[in-house]
A protein has these predicted regions:
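Long, charge-dense low-complexity segments
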Residues: 2-399, 564
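Flexible helix-coil transition and linker loops at the boundaries of alpha-helical arrays
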Residues: 400-405, 440-493, 520, 555-564
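TPR repeat positional signature
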Residues: 411, 415, 497, 531, ...
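Residue at a conserved register position within TPR or TPR-like alpha-solenoid repeats
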Residues: 422, 504, 538, 575, ...
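Structural motif corresponding to the intra-repeat A-B loop/turn of tetratricopeptide repeats
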Residues: 424, 507, 541, 578, ...
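Alpha-helical linker/edge segments of TPR/alpha-solenoid repeat scaffolds
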Residues: 461-483, 542-549, 573-583, 608-634, ...
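Short coil turns that delineate tetratricopeptide repeat
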Residues: 525, 559-562, 596, 671
Length: 687
């Protein structure tokens, strides 16, 4: 680990700021002996493990001398990385692997790590380093000035410092572009054949998230939002950088030395927060001319941090007042870099909760209260009626009928788990106990008074088990009659049936195992995992032709990545065992290495290729065409995703975000779309 300010040839920086003999870092650029461009310097951070790349740059700069000087760009990079405690990254990366990526959309950096296991301090260090690299990337853009790559020595270290502060105070300069976005096409408004209402919640959500994902910012932006077309309101929670990530020092051109600006970091953070709020407001107002009110809640450090500002913008004051200050340069003037009070007056706010302490730091505040038409009642408790369109599509009359995930009977669940823990002591006893659970839950289902009343009134009601939330939305694929309604059956009852199938299989009674497995499928026609017991039962009897047919049926309704990859894994082996090696290889190629069966799938695929020998297909072979010829459904199928897309857009537009959220997550994962992931997170979590 290297400390840039504690190595040789550091210009006597150990002697303090402006010590005698210290070089005037802002004077004249030195030639870059290595001929590196700023792009070359930045590329090194993704070309090697991040700790090595960071320490490598710090080492190079620390060893620079008159004969081999460091470029101004690299010297400033070393200064920022040292301030960000970058040398401590290696110890963090040992326990928590960190991967650095470069985003094609913004050309900025993104650190990938497991957010669920890392400490707040370690996370903060990683994000400080990420922000340093992002600021360097933005400084590089300033240096290039749209003229292509430039030498890393084109700016002195002092000039890089000034460019850095220019970056920090100019983030709202693109507000005009976002404000005028409502007239542009929204490529995400249509999902699998269903288009959201223009200016409706889905249109607003996808437009706003698109704008946020496009923002080129020096600090990571975390955000959640609610779009409410009914009241013309967008509420956004956004992360705002803490003071400790701002520069500690700044080059004083007049004095020819570096000066300590640590005391100004609180003001810089508050000023940045106000600029970010203005930029977010421009994106919100630019989502539709129907948006007349925007509330931005700033969260210190991360989206989970304390609220340190809550600002309400009105459309006309913003477009006529705030935007005027942004366009004429007052909002990004050098003298406002650390002056939040002046910026605050330029925002022309309708209401605010904003409290600066004597030291200039933002203090926690209560977010402004706002009434919205969007209702965030849990699905299991939501008695609102569905629209006729949704009723026919989802075979339900109220939102709560879509619930398949709430806990049903905790006591019965504990009883089931106890049986399974002790089943190896006596399989026959376990069978009897599980049969009791099946009988009890079946009786409860049959005696449900509400369902009985529906049937007596002439409504067809079918029992339904859903392995996951998506299965409930797909029931129209199982029954085309929109008048049919579904009754949620016991989750524990279904688990007992599945366990019975496995136990019967272990006991060698494959007929009984198959019978239970078929009942599981009958009760869960839209759940791909319900087919797994039958596939395993057939595998036990080596009926691989039958596995192929069952797997094809499962693929017709499979929607999640893990479900799809698991079925292809089982299908691949079945094809292999029936001698259809090319079909087997094509199936194995659809099992991602990162999936639960990825490692096993890769191992079996390699064994298969070894067995194929000279018959391994060449580069002109099309595995997708091979599967189509074999009649294998390439899940997720169009008719499945059309139902998903229709339900998603309608539920979102009709103010039912919690019912829409799982579908948004599914669509985002299927399309691998960060914008849709952001929409899904906001539908799920709100603000």
């Amino acid at each position: 680990m290297f400390d840039f300010f504690r190595k040789k040839n550091n210009g006597n920086r150990d002697g303090g700021e402006g010590a005698p003999g210290a070089p005037r870092s802002g004077e004249g650029a030195t030639a870059d002996a290595g001929g590196k461009t700023t792009r070359d310097v930045l590329a090194e951070f993704t070309a090697a493990p991040l700790p090595d790349a960071v320490d490598g740059l710090l080492f190079r700069v620390s060893m620079a001398d008159a004969a081999n000087p460091a470029s101004g760009f690299e010297a400033y990079a070393a200064r920022l990385l040292s301030d960000a405690e970058a040398p401590s990254l290696r110890a963090i990366a040992v326990e928590h692997p960190v991967e650095l990526r470069r985003l094609n959309t913004t050309n900025l950096f993104w650190s990938v790590f497991d957010d669920s296991t890392i400490s707040a301090g370690a996370r903060g260090t990683i994000l400080r380093i990420e922000s340093v690299l992002d600021r360097l990337a933005m400084i590089s853009m300033i240096m290039e000035d749209d003229n292509g790559a430039v030498p890393a020595s084109a700016f002195t270290e002092g000039q890089c410092s000034e460019a850095d502060w220019r970056v920090l105070r100019s983030i709202a300069n693109d507000a005009g572009r976002y404000l005028g976005a409502a007239d542009r096409d929204n490529k995400l408004d249509t999902q699998y054949g269903t288009t959201g209402t223009r200016g409706g919640n889905w249109d607003l959500s996808t437009r706003f998230a698109t704008a946020c994902e496009e923002m080129v910012l020096p600090f990571r932006l975390e955000y959640r939002f609610i779009c409410d077309s009914g009241t013309g309101t967008i509420v956004a929670d956004v992360s705002m950088p803490a003071p400790d990530v701002f520069p500690k020092s700044r080059f004083d051109e007049a004095g020819g030395q570096w000066v300590d600006v640590s005391a100004q970091r609180t003001g810089a953070a508050a000023a940045y927060g106000l600029r970010l709020a203005a930029l977010i407001a421009s994106a919100a107002f630019g989502s539709s001319v129907g948006v007349t009110r925007v509330i931005v809640n700033g969260k210190e450090g991360s989206i989970a941090g304390a609220t340190v500002m809550s600002l309400e913008f009105g459309r006309i004051p913003f477009t006529m007042g705030t935007m005027a200050a942004i366009r004429d340069g007052r909002f990004s003037a050098p003298e406002t870099a650390c002056d939040p009070a002046t910026l605050f007056d330029m925002l022309h706010l309708q209401n605010s909760a904003f409290n600066l302490a004597d030291d200039g730091s933002l203090q926690p505040v209560e977010p402004l209260e706002v009434e919205l038409a969007v209702v965030r009642t849990p699905v299991a408790e939501d008695d609102r009626e569905l629209s006729p369109e949704l009723r026919d599509l989802l075979h339900a009359d109220t939102v709560r009928e879509l619930d398949v995930m709430s806990e049903q009977d905790a006591e019965l669940g504990a009883r089931y788990r106890a049986i399974m823990e002790e089943k190896d002591d006596s399989l026959l006893l376990a069978v009897a106990q599980l049969e009791d659970i099946v009988a009890e839950t079946t009786k409860v289902t049959e005696e449900d008074e509400a369902v009985r009343a529906l049937r007596e009134s002439g409504v067809a009601v079918k029992p339904l088990y859903c392995e996951n939330v998506f299965a409930r939305y797909l029931v129209s694929l199982a029954d085309s009659d929109p008048a049919v309604r579904y009754q949620r059956v016991s989750d524990i009852g279904q688990a007992a049936r599945s366990s019975l199938s496995r136990i019967y299989r272990d006991m060698g009674d494959l007929d009984a195992a198959e019978a239970q497995a078929r009942v599981c499928i009958e009760l869960a026609p839209t759940s791909a995992p319900a087919y797994n017991d039958l596939i395993t039962c057939f595998a036990e009897g080596e009926h691989y032709d039958r596995i192929i047919e069952v797997a094809k049926e499962a693929l017709r309704i499979a929607v999640t990545g893990n479900d799809i990859s698991y079925i292809f894994y089982r299908l691949a082996f079945a094809y292999w065992q029936t001698g259809r090696l090319r079909e087997a290889l094509a199936c194995y190629l659809r099992v991602p290495e990162a999936s639960p069966m990825g490692e096993a799938g890769l191992r079996e695929r390699n064994d298969l290729i070894g067995e194929m020998g000279n018959d391994v297909p060449g580069n002109d072979w099309d595995p997708t065409a091979c599967l189509r010829t074999a009649g294998v459904p390439l899940a997720p199928l169009d008719d499945v995703m059309e139902v998903v897309g229709r339900a998603l857009v309608l539920l979102c537009d009709q103010n039912m975000p919690l019912a829409a959220a799982p579908l948004a997550s599914l669509v985002a994962s299927t399309q691998r779309n960060d914008i849709l992931h952001a929409v899904a997170a906001s539908l799920r979590q709100g603000v």
